[in-house]
């Protein structure tokens, strides 16, 4: 009897525990159904239809009947503002198709545009395509005789020098009826030249002509292109208005062949050359950098030694202090010409307190066979301690006009052995 009572009590306790466990499982599943995101009460019917179809498709994949919510939680996708809904047959709604990559109607033109400014995408913004101002046709210096535009190209294979004569502007002509022409020389050959057509009754002639010089590749970098602009009067006599000297160097012939070059006309020096020739150069002093700059431009009327085989002519520039040698630089050599053109720049370090004791010596030398050099002429510029006359005036003008290039001609004096 006692054993039967014990079995009965144990069965009752086991049944209660089983009932409690089943109740807990049902409670957890019942609570899980309320953890999903709740949709708003006033929803768009199209939105409800959209999610109903979404739910039906989910049931098909998960195997859960439509009348029962799946046990796997899901997240409601965000609503897309601004989408258009179109009605379908049967009372359903669908989203109208849209471009997956919508293009903005307007976009800012530039970073500096105002908040209200906008331009259509695909349109050209002219501010982005503005070319830099061409300053070649403005800024004519005082006393300018005119300006000439031209182009130079050298064809290595055919050894031809192509020169394009483009135009001239601001020519200073003696009369209103201006008729101009241009003669082209390839120095040092002064005898042969090419000539442009005469432009009548115009002070800003447009030539647009091409000329060809046959010159070897070995000597082209030693040549100088000379443009002489003439006024033709009623008697057909030629009056020189100005000239341009353009050295043909390696850096000039390299690069873009269609680059347009312009130069201001220079007056021809009518003074006869001195006994040993003349040299033209510029001086400039920068007191802030303590830098003395020398630009060797050209020489003329050099007395070459005919009894020797001439190879080339160059200029040696020496900086002296208290008549003691400090530093020396030299130009490139020009094939034996009595009128060589250099256009080369040199700089020397000179303190301000040394300007009263420093001087510059420029010597023109002729190189012969065997690399022997013979002086052709010499000039010294500096303070009163070393020079007089034009050489002293040139030095003084350089000091009065700091950071400016002061250009002058100087007569070469008797050479001394270097």
Curated annotation (Swiss-Prot):
Keywords: Membrane, Repeat, Signal-anchor, Transmembrane, Transmembrane helix
Chain ranges passing through the membrane: 5-27
SUPFAM superfamilies in the cross-refs: C2 domain (Calcium/lipid-binding domain, CaLB)
Side Cytoplasmic, residues: 28-418
Bilayer topology annotation: Single-pass type III membrane protein
Tissue expression remark: Isoform 1 and isoform 2 are expressed in heart, lung, skeletal muscle and testis; not detected in brain, liver and kidney. Isoform 1 is expressed in spleen.
Superkingdom classification of source: Eukaryota
Keyword Repeat listed: yes
Cross-referenced Gene3D superfamilies: C2 domain
Key word Amino-acid biosynthesis present: no
Domain C2: 144-261, 275-396
Compartments, record wording: Membrane
Topological region Extracellular: 1-4
PROSITE patterns on file: C2
GO cellular component terms listed in the entry, alphabetical order: membrane
Cited InterPro entries: C2_dom, C2_domain_sf, Synaptotagmin-15/17_C2A
Subunit structure: Homodimer.
Function recorded in the entry: May be involved in the trafficking and exocytosis of secretory vesicles in non-neuronal tissues.
Family, as annotated: Belongs to the synaptotagmin family.
Domains (record comment): Neither C2 domains mediates Ca(2+)-dependent or Ca(2+)-independent phospholipid binding.
Protein name: Synaptotagmin-15
Organism: Mus musculus
Organism lineage string: Eukaryota, Metazoa, Chordata, Craniata, Vertebrata
